[in-house]
Curated annotation (Swiss-Prot):
Annotated region (Disordered), positions in chain: 1-34
Function comment: Plays an important role in promoting lung pathology in both primary viral infection and secondary bacterial infection. Promotes alteration of mitochondrial morphology, dissipation of mitochondrial membrane potential, and cell death. Alternatively, inhibits the production of interferon in the infected cell at the level of host mitochondrial antiviral signaling MAVS. Its level of expression differs greatly depending on which cell type is infected, in a manner that is independent of the levels of expression of other viral proteins. Monocytic cells are more affected than epithelial cells.
Transmembrane segments: none
Gene Ontology biological-process annotations: symbiont-mediated perturbation of host apoptosis; symbiont-mediated suppression of host cytoplasmic pattern recognition receptor signaling pathway via inhibition of MAVS activity
Annotated protein name in UniProt: Protein PB1-F2
InterPro entries, A to Z: Flu_proapoptotic_PB1-F2
Remarks, miscellaneous: Is not encoded in all strains, and seems to be dispensable for replication.
Species: Influenza A virus (strain A/Hong Kong/5/1983 H3N2)
Superkingdom classification of source: Viruses
Amino acid sequence: MEQEQDTPWTQSTEHINIQKKGSGQQTQKLGRPNSTRLMDHYLRIMSQVDMHKQTVSWRLWLSLRNPTQGSLRTRALKQWKSFNKQGWTN
């Protein structure tokens, strides 16, 4: 197996894991994040973001496609308010 060499990148990405013992004392363990783990973490986060975006756009599409009574009421109120702001000048 090939070991990672100490480079400015690996030195700057060192992190500390603090674990509590049963007596309440803390021990510190130094370690470097594996580049594979970092990439895996990044891909997992981006996947969650994409899923959230898809969920939001799907809900929006459904609300426009099959409007509920509440969404119709909200839309009508917004139009009424904007109409009242313009006034009767037309």
